[in-house]
Amino acid sequence: MSEFKIVSRKDLYNEGEGLGEDYDSNSSSKNNSEHVEVLVPPTEFEFVEVERTDSSLDLKESNNSAHEQKEEKQEEFEFPLFSFGVVEASTSPAQEEQGSSTQEKDTPQTEVSLMKISLKEPEEEIINQERPKDYYFASYSADQKLQFQQSSIDYDVIIQESTKILEDDLRIRDKWPYCQGRIIDLYKHNARIELEQQKELKIKKRRPGQKQRAAKKLALERTKERDTKAREIKKQLKKKFHKRGGKKNKKKVPLNPLAKAGSTPKFRTE
């Protein structure tokens, strides 16, 4: 510990030469043969430009993936319930026929891997059932909009065309009053139809004359006569073709085929 010297922070930031001289004078009394060098720290900062990279982000992603893999491994574990321990390797049919004891000893043995059970729950699939905006909102190009403007009719155009039609109608009426085409005054037309309907109602409601009343009575009498004659003819036809049998109520005698079995047969010659 005699080789080291306690130096204050103020002495460290002084000039190197003055500090070296003081240190040499003090150390010469203790150890003249040894020479100790003192390193002065730099007082200026060095500015270094470093290009930024995404290594930090890559590290974060790698850490996250490693963490996820670790969690997955923790959720999966081996379950030895259905494992059967050690199973002999399958042999060829020729070796099975030999059945030597040496082959049974030398057969390699393989271990069955244990069943893995995972506690992970299946993630629910998020199905987006929304229709696209094109289904609700139509988007037209500039050419289509121009076509719509050309094919559409404004209010001013309708008024302008209607005035032209009225002018044409007046001109036709003035020049050819007898050839008006389909131009109809609805008020006059409806009034004429109403008059015709009223005339028809009056004709229906008025009382018929004496001759008409007599003709109606005669027609009713003759229709009655025709009906009575038709009924009589129908009755006569029924009596003619639908006669009742006379033996309807006679009692039937049961037939006995052995009633005349003892009688002698009769021939034509007898």
Swiss-Prot record:
Stretches with biased composition (Basic and acidic residues): 1-13, 49-73, 218-235
Listed Pfam families: DUF2011 (PF09428)
Bias (Basic residues) ranges: 204-216, 236-253
Record's compositionally biased regions (Polar residues): 90-102
InterPro entries xrefs: DUF2011
Signal peptide range: none
Region: Disordered, residue numbers: 1-76, 90-111, 204-270
Protein name from the UniProt record: Uncharacterized protein YNL050C
Organism annotation: Saccharomyces cerevisiae (strain ATCC 204508 / S288c) (Baker's yeast)
